[in-house]
Amino acid sequence: MVDHLANTEINSQRIAAVESCFGASGQPLALPGRVLLGEGVLTKECRKKAKPRIFFLFNDILVYGSIVLSKRKYRSQHIIPLEEVTLEPLPETLQAKNRWMIKTAKKSFVVSAASTTERQEWISHIEECVRRQLLATGRQPTTEHAAPWIPDKATDICMRCTQTRFSALTRRHHCRKCGFVVCAECSRERFLLPRLSPKPLRVCSLCYRELAAQKLREEAREGIGGSPPQLSHLGGTVCGASSGDDDDSDEDREGNGDGDWPTQVEFYASGVSWSAFHS
């Protein structure tokens, strides 16, 4: 069915409509063989609070963005190749239902659907597309994934020292390796995580020690001679960095954020969270 629809006029029109909604800020989405399979609104758990996001499932990519005007205008487009995606269903709680994690090497995050049925539809459609894409490309499933960021609201104290209490003056930071919410003192180090960024990123003290030790072991195995590795901030001092010189926000940070979780009505005001174009 997907192959049959790949170069049809209706498929081209649907993809063009999505491109139009993102406008000049979005990337071109039309490619030979690409099929738009469905769309819907999911709730993405962001750093400050959970927010509705529009998602589009293609046969080879997953696209999502912020909703400015439903079915008219979107922004902050993100494109995820499906061969990099792994899904992880999450357990139900009284406060959080119909959730699962979308994991990739560069970014992992939690989303939820309006109902159990819609959650299962999303998961089954994505997993089938991932399976087909891996088969087509001959690639193996990704085994290393970025840690999802713990939401700010999850804790009022540093998750490493458990002493520092966050406030308007004492800001939260996130370790890029484990995703924990930590204070400035417990996240003074930077470490190069090539899968995430070409620049050294903020990591917590525990992850830094583990990463530095791993790097030393790897260099020892490779038999690298000469002087020891230049880990200039091994003692805990960040080279040219302070608690506020790097961007601790993700792409979903808007305004100053009050940390309150939207109600379920706000989550799903745009309607059902899965709409298949091609069944």
UniProtKB/Swiss-Prot annotation:
Signal sequence annotation: none
The free-text tissue note of the record is: Widely expressed.
Residue spans annotated as Zn fingers (FYVE-type) read 152-212
Residues that bind Zn(2+) 1, according to the entry?
A: 158, 161, 183, 186
The answer to whether keyword Translocase applies is no
Gene Ontology CC annotation, any one: lysosome
Acidic residues composition bias: residue spans: 244-253
Domain named PH: residues: 35-131
* Alphabetical list of Pfam families matching this protein: FYVE, PH
Residues the record lists as binding Zn(2+) 2: 175, 178, 204, 207
Q: Known InterPro entries for this protein? A: PH-like_dom_sf (IPR011993), PH_domain (IPR001849), PH_domain-containing_F (IPR051765), PH_Phafin (IPR037871), PKHF1_FYVE (IPR042762), Znf_FYVE (IPR000306), Znf_FYVE-rel (IPR017455), Znf_FYVE_PHD (IPR011011)
Query: What molecular function terms (GO) are annotated for this protein?
Result: phosphatidylinositol-3-phosphate binding; phosphatidylinositol-4-phosphate binding; phosphatidylinositol-5-phosphate binding; zinc ion binding
SUPFAM superfamilies membership? FYVE/PHD zinc finger, PH domain-like
Q: Where is this region: Disordered?
A: 220-263
Instruction: List keywords of the entry alphabetically.
Output: Apoptosis, Cytoplasm, Lysosome, Metal-binding, Nucleus, Zinc, Zinc-finger
Taxonomically, which superkingdom?
Answer: Eukaryota
What is a biological process (GO) this protein takes part in?
Answer: apoptotic process
Functional note: May induce apoptosis through the lysosomal-mitochondrial pathway. Translocates to the lysosome initiating the permeabilization of lysosomal membrane (LMP) and resulting in the release of CTSD and CTSL to the cytoplasm. Triggers the caspase-independent apoptosis by altering mitochondrial membrane permeabilization (MMP) resulting in the release of PDCD8.
Free-text note regarding domains: PH and FYVE-type zinc finger domains are required for lysosomal location.
From the Swiss-Prot or TrEMBL record, give the protein name. Pleckstrin homology domain-containing family F member 1
Name its species: Mus musculus (Mouse)
